[in-house]
């Protein structure tokens, strides 16, 4: 399942990041970095044996991960358990069984999650180090031996991971609009969901989504079918306080993966935070429709310029999703909440929009006559034609003489031309180049 989450946990210095990077390097294709998107490489999309999941490096979640106190290791592990479907519990064969390993194992045994015990730093399978057998006492099954540094045993480990992934979640029809309500804790996600559903009063049913406790709520309005994926239901009462903010990003990932359109909720009293930027970046990189919903607008003192000034500030901080419409609402009072679904419908239309090849090339050819493709080191870039190759999000291929001659600034010009002529409000536009004659 695309939204399943697998976290690597363990005490400091057992090789969590090394294992993460080894799998990343072998099996993960990261979407190319876009200007303005904060990428902190703590997670990546993995596909193995036709199964997809999100791999999380918990070591990367805390900048001081390698010297944190044990109490923080415990918080980190508990937070990872809360957000994940499968846990890779990494131990160190060279150092052997440590008290911290036993404490983490105690936490994991109480958790109702799939746990795979992974014994790192085993350099050869011909003769296991004596310390390897000590880990059987943890009661978490046979340790899978690996060497994260040289890749030994990684394939066998991934085989085991896909066996333990949860079953596919409920499938909805292509016409059902899947909406993820995302944002950091206490921004008002549940209040917005309740207000939307309270207005419509046509809830079909509450369906427990995945093992992450997200709640899928299907409902209908004016003949259209929607599903609200509410990540707020994931945040349980917990002793975790310091880690909760960090892990809220992880909780949003699975919901984003399953959605078509994301409602990125921002607290009007705080403005966009670094956390909001991370969540928005993930939605953008995964090609989702995005609507920025500024909540708690009733708590802001206003004058004639407040909306314009606030809009400018949001655009500056979230410049990479400048295509996203901004709504100012109060989930508490219901102010302008009716506009949320109206905007979702508009973005959904843009998300599914197709442009005929003839019209597309007429518009682009006219624009390119005014602003011809640049030459690189004297060699001119020739653009032959452009085709739309997909929707959700709208995707285009530009056929050229030499793809390496295409500068990102000219791709940006093509994107801007498409937006000016065809709209695409609220959705990313994916443009790639291909040499003419290539399939």
Curated annotation (Swiss-Prot):
CDD domains: EngA1, EngA2
Annotated GTP 1 binding sites: 10-17, 57-61, 120-123
Record keywords, A-Z: GTP-binding, Nucleotide-binding, Repeat, Ribosome biogenesis
One Pfam short name: KH_dom-like
GO biological process annotation, one example: ribosome biogenesis
Function: GTPase that plays an essential role in the late steps of ribosome biogenesis.
Subunit structure: Associates with the 50S ribosomal subunit.
Family under the similarity heading: Belongs to the TRAFAC class TrmE-Era-EngA-EngB-Septin-like GTPase superfamily. EngA (Der) GTPase family.
Protein name in UniProt: GTPase Der
Organism this protein belongs to: Thermoanaerobacter pseudethanolicus (strain ATCC 33223 / 39E)
Gene: der
